[in-house]
Amino acid sequence: MKQSKKLGQCFLKDKNFVKKAIKSADITENDIVLEVGLGEGALTKELAKLAKFVYVIELDMRLEPFANQIMSEFKNVKVIWNDALKVDLKELGFNKIVANLPYQISSPITFKFLENDFDVAVLMYQYEFAKRMIGKPDTDEYSRLSVSIQYNSDVEFICKVPPTAFSPKPDVNSAIVKLTKREPLFHIENEEFFRNVLNAIFQHRNRTVKRALIDSSHEMNIERERLKEILENIKLDFDFSERVFKLAPEKIGELSNILYLNIISKK
């Protein structure tokens, strides 16, 4: 079967990396696992041998022969034919995620995962995307993604994966990353507002916090001039002259809380 470029299909063929991903997830007979992207089922079969149940979300119906073969062999596998971004993941009740993700949905599907409860996720990404996930302040890789993930997950870079591990060979290197959910490192007054602040400031990561906030005031649903007034009133509460890319995640949390208490709660 010819893989779809539109769907970003690169099937993982190298069994060494399949085994490495599964070992990193520490799958047991009590685990309910979510996989996004069936491929030809190399990963699915290995998961099914170990897990209590495996849900696979796949959009490409051309892969149905592979799905039927796997489900006839393993009764603990269910394939959901849908767009993973449209599926209500909360209904599935999984506790682990193991997937070779379609790279064009890496960002939205990762943010969707983070909105759900899980213990561990072992995921394949483009190498450059993976570096952003583990990005630290004052580095080129530090981003909204870095802060969003590190807020309530430990991130571990497992290994780099060469193009030769896939069919067809992608043009870039890939990487396996492990996310372990945990309690947040710092208190957030309102998580939706926190995400809005992240969206606002990282649109202008090289600017000062003040300039970034003003230029993206719409992300926080506040008029630009009103925000200027508020920032003037709270200028002693935070160093708004700092550059966005230098702010540690906990400082961004502090910024979010100050803004929330002075914007939303006083409306």
UniProtKB/Swiss-Prot annotation:
One GO cellular component term, please give it.
cytoplasm
**EC number(s) recorded for this UniProt protein:** 2.1.1.-
SUPFAM superfamilies (alphabetical): S-adenosyl-L-methionine-dependent methyltransferases
Superkingdom to which the source organism belongs: Archaea
Q: Could you say which residues bind S-adenosyl-L-methionine here? A: L12, G37, E58, D83, N100
Principal location:
cytoplasm
Q: What is the annotated role of this protein in its UniProt record?
A: Specifically dimethylates two adjacent adenosines in the loop of a conserved hairpin near the 3'-end of 16S rRNA in the 30S particle. May play a critical role in biogenesis of 30S subunits.
What name does this protein carry?
Probable ribosomal RNA small subunit methyltransferase A
